[in-house]
Amino acid sequence: MRTRGGIVTKRRRNKWLKLAKGYWGHKSIGFKVAKQAVVKSWTYAFRDRKQLKREFRKLWIARINAAARPLGITYSRLIEGLKVANIQINRKMLSELAINYPTAFSQIVEKAKTSLAKK
């Protein structure tokens, strides 16, 4: 007599189906397709965790550049000026200053400009 898949098999399948809950169509019902969808979602999640960091850095740079240009300096010259002036501030904080505290940002820009002029 043939032995059928018992409780162990059912538990294993339900574990994968639970991870696929909310997926569209057969991806949340069929075991094989659900397992493939879950594994694929993990690869997307891994890739996009790395990509998110890149996207935010691009956003911060764009904001800094947009705020610095009316003050008469480009982004690259501003970063160079900050390095010469030995001002260690990251791009995220510079972006926050540019948006929420424009006067503080303009003071930092002026220090960067003066350090570039002395160079």
From Swiss-Prot:
Keywords: Ribonucleoprotein, Ribosomal protein, RNA-binding, rRNA-binding. It holds the Pfam family Ribosomal_L20. One of its GO terms (molecular function) is rRNA binding. PROSITE patterns: RIBOSOMAL_L20. The keyword Kinase does not apply. InterPro entries: Ribosomal_bL20, RIBOSOMAL_L20_CS, Ribosomal_protein_bL20_C. GO terms for biological process: ribosomal large subunit assembly; translation. GO terms for cellular component: ribonucleoprotein complex; ribosome. CDD domains: Ribosomal_L20. Binds directly to 23S ribosomal RNA and is necessary for the in vitro assembly process of the 50S ribosomal subunit. It is not involved in the protein synthesizing functions of that subunit. PANTHER family: 39S RIBOSOMAL PROTEIN L20. HAMAP family: Ribosomal_bL20 (MF_00382). Belongs to the bacterial ribosomal protein bL20 family. This is Large ribosomal subunit protein bL20. It comes from Metamycoplasma arthritidis (strain 158L3-1) (Mycoplasma arthritidis). The gene is rplT.
